[in-house]
């Protein structure tokens, strides 16, 4: 029986390297195996104990099984995503969409959305359409980010990137399709489950998180900073990039869950700050592992940020200080959870620790 969480942060890597899935049928088979691979990875690998940090929001007699929780949520999200993009005409675009959307991954953003919803009194069913919408947008951003005109990446989640399989033209359209589908899915599927005023607020939050006040702003700043002397750019600009390019969508995932779950304004704002902290934490750790892990371990090309002379935390302040920043952000995230029910908040406490300790 699992009393504490022993989760190697590399354990969520789904082994699909070296394979191409050019049909709906073959990718459906992959989808079925992904859940099994995720389960095996989480239950077979050891790692650093991830017990929620002690504090007012934690019961010392309660140990949360994060492995089982993450497996359950990943299974639920993957099944919901599979249903959301059925094979239909035109098959060419559907195959490209499904290839990236159903490629596994850690499902951190939908998990965060569901956990936030459950924390404030909602349930998984109510949060699922928003959780799927966030993952669709995240996948859209990855497809576009990997394009030759952006990061020019060959691998994503251990597989050839979307444009390597389907061509640049189809990859652009797949990303566009997912962006539109996210809002359609969230509003149509949630109809009758979420009060209209809360849905309108949720749509506004999500749109803001991915536009010129969020993800796009971060991407533009990142592109404009490439090749510059990091000391001329500075830490403030680096934080702006990461808060917008990465943290904005994670923050939105938490906020959407809290809004849809019926949270109070105080609860929504606490979870907003939590999401922002773990969002920045996610990117700081991503910067660290880009220079400390191999391509095989990452499931994507290692060292690309260095080769592109991108502005990163290790490049600006070094590895040790970057690790200190990561730990500080983990603590700040945990502080936002004080005052919530200790059992209900356990997934979010464990999630912050998982992000801080991950290797891919």
UniProtKB/Swiss-Prot annotation:
What is one cellular component GO term in this UniProt entry?
chloroplast
SUPFAM superfamilies in the cross-refs: Terpenoid synthases (SSF48576)
Q: Which reaction does it catalyse?
A: isopentenyl diphosphate + dimethylallyl diphosphate = (2E)-geranyl diphosphate + diphosphate; isopentenyl diphosphate + (2E)-geranyl diphosphate = (2E,6E)-farnesyl diphosphate + diphosphate; isopentenyl diphosphate + (2E,6E)-farnesyl diphosphate = (2E,6E,10E)-geranylgeranyl diphosphate + diphosphate
Q: What is its EC number?
A: 2.5.1.-, 2.5.1.1, 2.5.1.29, 2.5.1.10
**Which residues does the annotation say bind dimethylallyl diphosphate?**
156, 245-246, 283, 300, 310
Give yes or no: UniProt keyword Plastid: yes
Q: Which UniProt keywords apply?
A: Carotenoid biosynthesis, Chloroplast, Isoprene biosynthesis, Magnesium, Metal-binding, Plastid, Transferase, Transit peptide
Alphabetically, which GO biological process terms does the record hold?
carotenoid biosynthetic process; farnesyl diphosphate biosynthetic process; geranyl diphosphate biosynthetic process; geranylgeranyl diphosphate biosynthetic process
Q: In which pathway does it act?
A: Isoprenoid biosynthesis; farnesyl diphosphate biosynthesis; farnesyl diphosphate from geranyl diphosphate and isopentenyl diphosphate: step 1/1; Isoprenoid biosynthesis; geranyl diphosphate biosynthesis; geranyl diphosphate from dimethylallyl diphosphate and isopentenyl diphosphate: step 1/1; Isoprenoid biosynthesis; geranylgeranyl diphosphate biosynthesis; geranylgeranyl diphosphate from farnesyl diphosphate and isopentenyl diphosphate: step 1/1
- Kindly give the Gene3D superfamilies that the UniProt entry links to this protein: Farnesyl Diphosphate Synthase (1.10.600.10)
- Residues that, per the record, bind isopentenyl diphosphate: 106, 109, 138, 157
Binding-site residues for Mg(2+) 2, renumbered to this chain? 145, 151
Q: Where does Mg(2+) 1 bind?
A: 145, 151
The family database entries (PROSITE patterns) matched by this protein are listed as: POLYPRENYL_SYNTHASE_1, POLYPRENYL_SYNTHASE_2
**What EC class is this?**
transferase
Chief location category: plastid
Cofactors needed by this protein, per the record, are: Mg(2+)
Cofactor comment: Binds 2 Mg(2+) ions per subunit.
The transit peptide segment here is 1-39
Entries under InterPro entries matching the protein: Isoprenoid_synthase_dom_sf, Polyprenyl_synt, Polyprenyl_synt_CS, Prenyl_diphosphate_synthase
Reported function: Catalyzes the trans-addition of the three molecules of IPP onto DMAPP to form geranylgeranyl pyrophosphate.
Quaternary state and partners of this protein? Answer: Monomer.
Q: Which family does it belong to?
A: Belongs to the FPP/GGPP synthase family.
What protein name does the entry list? Geranylgeranyl pyrophosphate synthase 12, chloroplastic
Native species: Arabidopsis thaliana
């Amino acid at each position: 029986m699992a009393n504490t969480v022993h989760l190697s942060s590399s354990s969520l890597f789904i082994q699909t390297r070296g394979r191409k899935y050019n049909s709906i049928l073959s990718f459906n088979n992959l989808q079925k195996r992904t859940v099994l691979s995720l389960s095996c990875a989480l239950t077979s690998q050891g790692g650093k104990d991830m017990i929620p940090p002690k504090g007012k929001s934690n019961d010392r007699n309660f140990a949360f099984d994060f492995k089982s929780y993450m497996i359950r949520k990943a299974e639920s999200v993957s099944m919901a995503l599979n249903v959301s993009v059925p094979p239909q005409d035109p098959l060419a675009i559907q195959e490209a969409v499904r290839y990236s959307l159903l490629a596994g991954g850690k499902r951190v953003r939908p998990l965060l959305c569901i956990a936030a919803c459950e924390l404030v009194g909602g349930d998984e069913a109510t949060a699922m359409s928003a959780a799927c919408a966030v993952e669709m947008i995240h996948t859209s951003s990855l497809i576009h980010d990997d394009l030759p005109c952006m990061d020019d990446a060959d691998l994503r989640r251990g597989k050839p990137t979307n444009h390597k399989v389907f061509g640049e033209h189809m990859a652009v359209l797949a990303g566009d399709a997912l962006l539109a589908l996210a809002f359609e899915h969230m509003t149509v599927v949630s109809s009758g489950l979420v009060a209209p005023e809360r849905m309108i607020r949720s749509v506004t939050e999500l749109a803001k998180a991915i536009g010129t006040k969020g993800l796009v702003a971060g991407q533009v700043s990142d592109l404009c900073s490439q090749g510059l002397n990091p000391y001329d750019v500075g830490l403030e600009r680096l934080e702006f990039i990461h808060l917008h390019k990465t943290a904005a969508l994670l923050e939105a995932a938490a906020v959407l869950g809290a809004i849809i779950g019926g949270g109070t304004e105080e609860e929504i704002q606490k979870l907003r700050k939590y999401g922002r902290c773990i969002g920045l934490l996610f990117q700081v750790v991503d910067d660290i592992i880009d220079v400390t892990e191999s391509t095989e371990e990452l499931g994507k090309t290692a060292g690309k940020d260095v080769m592109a002379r991108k502005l990163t935390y290790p490049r600006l302040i070094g590895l040790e200080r970057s690790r200190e920043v990561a730990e500080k952000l983990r603590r700040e995230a945990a502080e936002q959870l004080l005052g919530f029910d200790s059992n209900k908040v356990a997934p979010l406490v464990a999630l912050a620790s998982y992000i801080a300790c991950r290797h891919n």
